Each structure stands twice: as structure tokens, then as C-alpha cells.
Amino acid sequence: MAAVVSAAGGACPAVLQVAGLYRGLCAVRSRALGLGFVSPAQLRVFPVRRGSGLPPEGADGSGVSELEANPFYDRYRDKIQQLRRSDPAAFESRLEKRSEFRKQPVGHSKQSDFIKCMEQKTDALGKQPVSKGFTKDKTLSSVFNVEMVKDKTAEEIKQIWQQYFSAKDTVYAVIPKEKFDLIWNRAQSCPTFLCALPRRDGYEFFVGQWTGTELHFTALINIQTRGDAAASQLILYHYPELKEEKGIVLMTAEMDSTFLNVVEAQCIANQVQLFYATDRKEIYGLVETFNFRPNEFKYMSVIAELEQSGLGAELKRAQNQDKT
């Protein structure tokens, strides 16, 4: 039984030319390329722009100007403004870190401090108060009648799960025990990774962080500008309650529809299996490099694997249709 991530509601060419725009986005020029409502519980939020009432910029203002030029800037403007007003020193510090990154060769990243930040962020996850949005401590029994399926086969449970969520605006999957065990074991040693989401103007990077059987995602720009206050924009919930008896793990998701639609969330969710469940050492090697040798990590390797897998093809087609 293969695990296929579904959403209710061919290999692609490798990258030919890249222009580094900012730490969270790479615009790529190449030949033509081929999840659920969020409950605000563990929702964190994000990033700013020049405007009246804001603290003065640096000497040349280049850091702020570059940030405003970010294609995704408008999406995070209010949160960035909030950070700039409430803690100007922290805001300037984050701009300086971005400037340091820009001095590195395109495709390379100095991630040591970033990994440390993500580890601290994970420790803080369980301490955050429940708020509107994501569901805290979500269990299988909260979304599914476990008693009803005790006498069902794995295939019957799979059909029930798929039928139930196919009518909902969400991402869901039924993962075979062997595949989940592989993902889970690898997540214990490599709990953090980076996914690339195709956008009209390039790719936006999302950071994934395991906390228990939940996998939280947030845009890289959020972490750069908000640090520990960065909010989860997508959470994948894995339910292992039936793993030993039925040989399957059920998965569903919640997302912040302000930032992600279902097709985008599905693209991110599929990359979990692409990088964590692969039998190709070079692909999982990217995850290991990100966690253990961050200074050697290349952002563009993630994009290259995503393109070769074809996982972003549907999203690209939808974006191209929107253009017309």
C-alpha cells in the first residue's frame, strides 16, 4: 500500500539559472516545468514596511528597501510593522543577519544559528497558550470514531478516511506502517527541514519542524523576521493509534488559509515523503546536511529535487492558469 497525500477539493528539468532575491526566495528561470482549515490554537504570526510612525531606517535604508522588494512582503506587512514598532533593535538585528547572508555564494547557506533558533522554537511550542486557529493536543478520537473501525480491515479504514475527508477542504493521507516508521525514525535524528513551494515569481521556502507526531510548517521569512514568535501556517497531524493493529497511520492537516491554499499545503505535505521516506541516500542526505552540516546546505538542491519529482507541477499549472 503506497501512501499518497491527497487534497479535497513527469519529471521536470533541473534548474538552469538562479537569481538570489532574499533568504526566503530564489527566482528560477528554466525550461517549462512540466490542506484543511486551521484552528488558531498554535497559530503564531509574522513580517514590514516603511510607513509613518516607524523608527528611522539605517544609514542607507537598503535593508528595509530590499525587504519591501520581497515579492511576499505584502503578505507579512502588518506583522513586520508590529515588530519594527515594538522592538526596533530586534528588527534591525534581523536585517543585519539578512545582509550577512547576502554576501554568501548563491545556493549556499550559513545555517548554524538558524538551526539553533529552530530548536529553541520547538522547545517553546508546548508552552504556548491556546489561541484561535490550530487544535492543541489533537487526538484521533477527536476527529474519528475509533470504536466504529475496530473490526474493519486496513483497506476499509482507508476508504472511510478518504471518503470522510474528500468532502472537506483539507489535506489527508493513509500511510503504511513501514513508511511511517522510516519517516518517524529519521525525524528523531533530523527533526527540521526546508521545503520549497512554487510561486509565480520563484520559490518560497517553508521550514518544517517535528514536535511529537505533529509536523509544523512556517515560511522562512517568518522565522527571519519574527524568530520565536513565528506562527505555524500548516500542521500535519499523524495518528499512530492503529499502526500496530492495522498497519496504517492516518494523517490530516490544518492550515492558515490566509497564507496557504489546499493545493499549496498538499505540495508541502508531499515533500515530507519525498525527503524523509525516500530510499535514495542522496535525497535524504539533504535532510542530514541541513541538520548536521548546515554550512554545507544548498537551498537550490531542494528546488532541483522538487522539480525532478514533479510534485510542484500541478501547482505550477494552476498558477499559470491564474495568469491567463
Curated annotation (Swiss-Prot):
Disruption phenotype: Mice lacking Atpaf1 are viable. Though it is not essential for embryonic development, its deficiency leads to growth retardation and lactatemia respectively in young and adult mice.
Any one biological process term the GO annotation gives: mitochondrial proton-transporting ATP synthase complex assembly
Broad class of the protein's primary localization: mitochondrion
GO molecular function: protein-containing complex stabilizing activity
One of the record's GO cellular component terms: mitochondrial inner membrane
Keyword annotations from UniProtKB, A to Z: Membrane, Mitochondrion, Mitochondrion inner membrane, Transit peptide
Source superkingdom: Eukaryota
UniProt-annotated location(s): Mitochondrion inner membrane
The organelle targeting sequence, given as a residue range: 1-54
Membrane topology: Peripheral membrane protein
Expression across tissues: Widely expressed but with low level.
Function comment: Has a complex stabilizing activity in the assembly of the mitochondrial F1-F0 complex.
Similarity section: Belongs to the ATP11 family.
Assembly and oligomerization: Interacts with ATP5F1B; involved in the assembly of the F1 component of the mitochondrial ATP synthase (ATPase).
Name of the featured protein: ATP synthase mitochondrial F1 complex assembly factor 1
Gene: Atpaf1
